[in-house]
């Protein structure tokens, strides 16, 4: 028995369709706010003899536009919105969040060795996301250990780290199998992007996302799930095996980055050595990878970071 029906919803983003999930009068991650996405979701609801006004709750796994954009329309139609406590302020003021990220990462990327003009271009690009993700009020801000009832099933909330600020999973048991809605934290055939994240509050310490993501994946593996319902593409039917593959990929790239910092090297130099001449549209992802693996080396005591005249360099510690 399948508790959730997967509905691929079109997005304008490179990743392709996002998976919305329907169960009774609940929608999980409805998709971006576009007419094409809305028509797809409406058609899926109609196949189940529902209209948008019949949806009672929207669960949001993480505050990325391709996942939560349509939550605003569904809430206007009468649904309540459920998201994590950490994601709530982002969802409720998404333009403000984008402005905060732009300011933080412009300065940070310059410190990493990026030209000021390039940093401006790279950090301006995400502003387009606001067109697909209107802010939405969160009616129920949940934390790890909280439960949500969906079509007679009890879903338990737990924290995830690595892909987005405030991401959570919803776990449940059906047919004797432990299953979880995991958003984009684990995907079947592509490696999730461990995106850089700013401090929760201005002036705070930048979170070291990739080391935390590796730890989160290891914890998720030990939880013993039998199936993951993912944010894109097909479900993961062998979670432990897939997590092992992702962790192996991370370890291999970390070793390559270690080889690149035998001498003091900026994060931008590392990004260019890994990926070549990336277009501006892909440099945020590239910097997330480069800085993430440098953070892993730093956390393990395998690299030394220095800042001289406002520029960061990393050097391997042998």
What does each model-identified segment do?
Residues 33-34, 152-244, 248-249:
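Metallo-beta-lactamase
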Residues 247-259:
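Gly/Ser/Thr-rich active-site loops/lids in small-molecule metabolic enzymes
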Residues 1-48, 169-189:
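Conserved beta-strand hairpin/beta-sheet module of binuclear metal-dependent hydrolase folds
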Residues 25-27, 58, 80, 178-180, ...:
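Hydrophobic "anchor" residues on beta-strands that sit immediately upstream
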């Amino acid at each position: 028995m399948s508790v959730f029906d997967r509905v691929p919803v079109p997005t304008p983003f490179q990743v392709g369709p996002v998976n919305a999930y329907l169960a009774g009068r609940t929608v999980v991650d409805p998709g971006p706010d576009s007419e094409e996405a809305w028509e797809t979701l409406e058609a899926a609801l109609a196949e189940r003899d529902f209209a948008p006004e019949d949806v009672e709750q929207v669960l949001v796994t993480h505050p990325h536009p391709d996942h939560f954009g349509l939550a605003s329309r569904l809430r206007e139609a009468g649904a309540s919105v459920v998201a994590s406590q950490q994601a709530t302020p982002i969802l409720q003021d998404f333009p403000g969040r984008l402005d905060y990220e732009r300011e933080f990462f412009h300065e940070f990327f310059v410190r990493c060795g990026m030209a000021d003009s390039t940093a401006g271009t790279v950090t301006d690009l995400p502003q387009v996301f606001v067109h697909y993700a209107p802010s939405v009020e969160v009616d129920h801000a949940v934390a790890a250990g909280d439960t949500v009832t969906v079509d007679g099933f009890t879903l338990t909330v737990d924290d995830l780290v690595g892909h987005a600020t405030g991401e959570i999973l919803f776990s449940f048991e059906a047919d004797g199998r432990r299953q979880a809605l995991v958003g984009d934290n684990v995907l079947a055939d592509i490696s999730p992007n461990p995106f850089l994240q700013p401090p929760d509050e201005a002036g705070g310490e930048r979170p070291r996302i990739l080391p935390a993501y590796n730890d989160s994946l290891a914890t998720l593996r030990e939880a013993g799930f039998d199936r993951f319902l993912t944010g894109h593409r097909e479900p993961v039917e062998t979670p432990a095996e897939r997590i092992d593959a992702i962790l192996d990929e991370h370890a291999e790239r970390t070793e390559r980055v270690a080889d690149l910092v035998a001498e003091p090297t900026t994060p931008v130099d590392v990004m260019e050595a890994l990926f070549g001449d990336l277009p501006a549209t892909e440099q945020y992802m590239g910097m997330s990878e480069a800085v993430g693996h440098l953070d892993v080396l730093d956390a393990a005591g395998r690299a030394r970071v220095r800042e001289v005249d406002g520029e960061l360099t990393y050097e391997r510690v042998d």
